[in-house]
Amino acid sequence: MSGHSKWHNIQGRKNAQDAKRGKIFQKISRDLYQAAKAGDPDPDNNPQLRLVMDKARAANMPKQNIQRAIDKATGAGGANFEEITYEGYGPGGVAVMVFCLTDNKNRTAAAIRSAFTHSGGSLGATGSVSYMFNRQGLIEILRDGLDKDEDDMLMDALDAGADDMQATDDKFQIFTDPSAMTSVRDALQEQGYELETAEVTMIPENKTKVPADKVGQYQHLIDELEDNDDVADVYEAAFVEDADQGE
């Protein structure tokens, strides 16, 4: 029994690691697509694409996955992918936005609607929750190995054209106007900074606490959305209390 139990524990950890790795690859694929779509598909002529490709290699993302994401943007793979945004409410009334890249709108719409419905949420009309989010540029720089304190980093960010900065224990988060993200990114790179993230994202104005009895349903919704191959990104205005605090 102990050997059987040990095997299941190992398998369980492996499955969790595989799921986490898959979500990382999914986000990188989205970033590759957007970088290639917005600029030249040749990384030598596209700094943003080059940055994301470096991140993909660091995450040990297979070469064919990297190329597939770029092909989606250029149409080289033969399929015509569309960008579609879905908006809705998760369990507890939490606003959720789902960005998709799909070659079959009917398939994607059915899957997204099913995810919301089966989790106790509801899919809304265009504009039903997007007003609760702000579109912003986000640049992240890891603090590890960085010879800069918070004040110096803030001055460099503002000089580069950023709007604001927040510091956490492990990183600096630099916020920009969406149209200025590229120029701020380039200015920081010219100063020698290594960027962990440089993207335009959706940031909620306020977060809604998920009721304790809805946390399981809510997490099921997010997991189902993120596991869908058509889903490029999920933005949520949720505050989820730690399990230990909720009990």
From Swiss-Prot:
Give the Gene3D superfamilies listed for this entry.
Answer: 1.10.10.200, 3.30.70.980
- GO terms for CC? cytosol
Gene Ontology terms describing biological process: regulation of DNA-templated transcription
User: What InterPro entries does the database record attribute to this sequence?
Assistant: Integrase-like_N (IPR017856), TACO1_YebC-like_2nd/3rd_dom (IPR048300), TACO1_YebC_N (IPR049083), Transcrip_reg_TACO1-like (IPR002876), Transcrip_reg_TACO1-like_dom3 (IPR026564), YebC-like (IPR029072)
Task: Give positions of region: Disordered.
Answer: 1-22
Q: Which SUPFAM superfamilies match?
A: YebC-like
Keyword presence, Transcription: yes
Question: Per the annotation, which location comes first and is thus the protein's main one?
Answer: cytoplasm
Q: Where in the cell is it found?
A: Cytoplasm
Q: Which cysteines are joined by disulfide bonds?
A: none
- Reading the lineage from the top rank, the first entry is Bacteria
* Gene Ontology molecular-function annotations: DNA binding
How far does the signal peptide extend, from start to end residue? none
Sorted keywords for this record are: Cytoplasm, DNA-binding, Transcription, Transcription regulation
Q: Which family does it belong to?
A: Belongs to the TACO1 family.
Write down the HAMAP family for this protein, in alphabetical order.
Transcrip_reg_TACO1 (MF_00693)
What is the designated name of this protein?
Probable transcriptional regulatory protein LAF_0541
